[in-house]
Amino acid sequence: MIYTLYIIATLGVTIFYTLLTQLYIRSRKKHNRLRSQYLRQVSAAVLADSDSLAIAITASSRRERLALADAIYTTASHCYDHNHSITALIAQENNLEKHLLRELRFATKYRQGLLWLQLATISPSHHYTLQLRQELHNSDPHIRSCSLIALLCTSPEESIKTLLELDFELQPYDISRIISLVRRGVLPFAFERLLQSGNYNLKLLAISIVRHFNLDIYTKYIYSLLGNKEHPKLITEVIYTLTTMKHPLNSPLLRRHILAMPPSQRKALCRHLSAEGYSLQALRWLLPNNEMEYAERLITSHKRQLSQSNRAQV
């Protein structure tokens, strides 16, 4: 009897969660259909820079508003120096700011981060700046990261002050998001100020920007950081930046820092150097003899050729 009840209960729970999964999948499909529809409309309005097309975009239900907010965020994330007044007009006509703020109260942690990003993109306002600054101290790294990007979007003129006041170290994901804002023209950084700052986060961001945009004129300054008593992570970023920019490897200072790395980090750097096209002879100068066999296998493997051919296509 007990065994039969156990089987029935198990089947009931299985059926319940199966139904929940099916409902969620159906809901996501509807959301994606609406989002695709709004993406076409928002993109057309932004490209045409047309107020009339923007006003024609309507969202009356909760599902439609969420899909429209997602579409505006996606469009803005892929546009460079676009006219924000068009997306702001769409948001205003559909009262998106009010509805997104209401969604924030009941959202899960992951969803909260996405809603902050959408809110900052759709309607960058100083009304919720204080709340965003409070979220920077959240223990959840996802919410913290999303809140930082949202705050930079809403108050770009205070971006350096915001980064200076952070009580956590920027992670690679944060850096890539900030660089995306720089590329899109959202953040008006005074770049020299970043490089000359004694703040870890600002200097890390500056080094990453040099690498990302291949700013050759700052190579000498970046190399000079190897001679300073910098944070170990900054030294690693400097090495990756110099090698990405094809800096010669025949430097005693560079070799000393690479030999001081833990073997696991040196192995990762070896993969990076191989992908960047450095020769086996150049690596012999940098790596210990017992690690040269691994470097030789990397350089002569087909993976290196695939990596370089993919970069050439991009």
Which role does the model predict for each range below?
Residues 107-108, 139-141, 167-172, 198-199, ...:
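Short inter-helical turns and helix N-cap capping residues of alpha-solenoid HEAT/ARM repeat scaffolds
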Residues 42-43, 53-56, 68, 72, ...:
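Generic structural signal of hydrophobic/aromatic residues within well-ordered alpha-helices
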Residues 293-294, 306-309, 314:
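Long, low-complexity regulatory tails in eukaryotic proteins
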Residues 91-104, 125-136, 156-167, 184-196, ...:
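Amphipathic alpha-helical scaffolding segments comprising HEAT/armadillo-like alpha-solenoid repeats
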Residues 288-296:
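Short glycine/proline-enriched turn or capping motifs at secondary-structure junctions
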Residues 23-108:
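N-terminal topogenic membrane-targeting module
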Residues 1-35:
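N-terminal signal-anchor transmembrane alpha helix of single-pass membrane proteins
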Residues 74-75, 81-91, 113-124, 144-154, ...:
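Structural detector for internal amphipathic alpha-helices that build alpha-solenoid repeat scaffolds
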